[in-house]
Amino acid sequence: MQTVMMDDIQSTDSIAEKDNHSNNESNFTWKAFREQVEKHFSKIERLHQVLGTDGDNSSLFELFTTAMNAQLHEMEQCQKKLEDDCQQRIDSIRFLVSSLKLTDDTSSLKIESPLIQCLNRLSMVEGQYMAQYDQKLSTIKEMYHKLESYCNRLGSPFVLPDFENSFLSDVSDAFTESLRGRINEAEKEIDARLEVINSFEEEILGLWSELGVEPADVPQYEQLLESHTNRPNDVYVTQELIDQLCKQKEVFSAEKEKRSDHLKSIQSEVSNLWNKLQVSPNEQSQFGDSSNINQENISLWETELEKLHQLKKEHLPIFLEDCRQQILQLWDSLFYSEEQRKSFTPMYEDIITEQVLTAHENYIKQLEAEVSANKSFLSLINRYASLIEGKKELEASSNDASRLTQRGRRDPGLLLREEKIRKRLSRELPKVQSLLIPEITAWEERNGRTFLFYDEPLLKICQEATQPKSLYRSASAAANRPKTATTTDSVNRTPSQRGRVAVPSTPSVRSASRAMTSPRTPLPRVKNTQNPSRSISAEPPSATSTANRRHPTANRIDINARLNSASRSRSANMIRQGANGSDSNMSSSPVSGNSNTPFNKFPNSVSRNTHFESKSPHPNYSRTPHETYSKASSKNVPLSPPKQRVVNEHALNIMSEKLQRTNLKEQTPEMDIENSSQNLPFSPMKISPIRASPVKTIPSSPSPTTNIFSAPLNNITNCTPMEDEWGEEGF
């Protein structure tokens, strides 16, 4: 036991020596205590030997341990308290630095030994920061109390900042400036509300004066007047006070407006009665003030109105005639029909009574209410009516053939005005008609009757005008027509293709293995010196230059030579008339000559008689031994269009009859003209050579169809070379 005790003492001694070696090198108290303890232990051991006891010193060691533990605990508590105080000072310093928004570094603040000196040093630093904090906090509190008084005067909408959460944790210069800004804002709000209150009070006092209100009639008159003249500095300017004054102002303003309207209605009625009764202006000017709205002035006007009503009963015919004139004007503005006008029977009665006049006046009010309710709709109707009137004037002026040739003083701006009216109609009339359709529909649904425009339903007129007109024959009409050698699809043509004429052609025999290729670019035009009539060779033009022209051979024939000259000339002239016509609405039609062979399609070229320029190349047709090409031509075909214009439909009928007289029994495949305006090139005769539908091929072996061409051409031996539009030689 003694050995363990000594070991504990030695271990404690070693720990103490390690902890206090640097600070207590000159302190020998613990060594002296240890020496005394060792002496005591040596004496105790000798006494145990002398006494012969077992050497039990447990009670002594227990007392010694208890004393040491008590001392150790006391010192540990003291250390902990000093450390807590130091940490509290550090936290306080950091809070003050944060509240002051300083840039000082507080991370170096630590608890160091010795603790008493560390605590003293931290307390000194805390005092320095606390002085700055207290100074700024006192300034902020003064500003806060001032702001609090302002907020009390302004009322609940103007809320104070939170005292605990706002500036106690922030006493920086930025927060001070923000608080000062709030004070300035409150002062401005007080001034603004004072101005509003003063304005309301002045207006209320003015309204009382205009309405003739006496102080005895209004309980708060004296209080309001005293507040307006002698207002204290700390008066409350809450929003409730402003709302109360605003309500009072609205009440008296409504009373003023009511009296003003009543007075104006009386004055208007009195003025109308004065004019109808022919009261002299001097008597009118001598009457009371027209702008005063007090009760006395209104009573004077009411008395005058009663007198005039008595005179009105004595002059009913004058008033009845005036009412009927007003009704006629309202009828015109509402575009009433005759049936609607006749529905008001008092208009056509000869009885003149006060009840009839009252019925007229009530009907006028009804019509005026209808005009007011349909103001926007009627303005659109008037716009449409003005356009229709301009259209009628334009038609009347255009139908007058002598407007430009009449003698005497002429109108040089007539054509310019007509053109302006025409442009205005084309620009605005469709737009107005499209806008009228939903408006008229809604009007008819509201009123339960049809809106008539000069006894005609305007909705039907607008719907018919806005629907696209069919400029061409419908598909059903085309299906019911008897089939001829060729058919032309002109329904879907563009306006630029309406003047083109489609020429029927014989079915070309095309190789099944070779499809139609894209058109080739035509060669430059070369004057045809051999034949003045433009014919088409039996073969399409080649891609070579004009230097490599083809030479005539025995097996190439000129089909045009076999045609009747007279029939060729007539058909060519009709084709030229249809092609060179200036009517853009002409539809394409098939053309045929008076011969045994129907015309083939013309190759693409540039016409001399049109202002169009073909940009499409010449189509490249595949040839077979039995394929022939022909063109309606004559020896003396004029290059300029004839003076007489042939209508396309008329030419269609004539040439269809000629085609039937040829007794062609073969089944000619139907042709469709290409619908696309971009893929449809121009030809000299305004004929499109491009097919839209697949072309039926004719077999190369002899057939009843090919016999038509081979029968009359067996003994032809002399063939003359010809040139087409591109300078290519043909036969």
Swiss-Prot record:
Residue ranges, compositional bias (Low complexity) = 560-596
Q: Which InterPro entries match?
A: MAP65_Ase1_PRC1 (IPR007145)
User: Where is this protein localized, as stated in its record?
Assistant: Cytoplasm, Cytoskeleton; Cytoplasm, Cytoskeleton, Spindle
Does this UniProt record's set of keywords contain Phosphoprotein?
Answer: yes
Q: Residues bearing Phosphoserine? A: S537
Protein known as: Anaphase spindle elongation protein 1
Region: Disordered, residue numbers: 472-642
Family stated for the protein in its record: Belongs to the MAP65/ASE1 family.
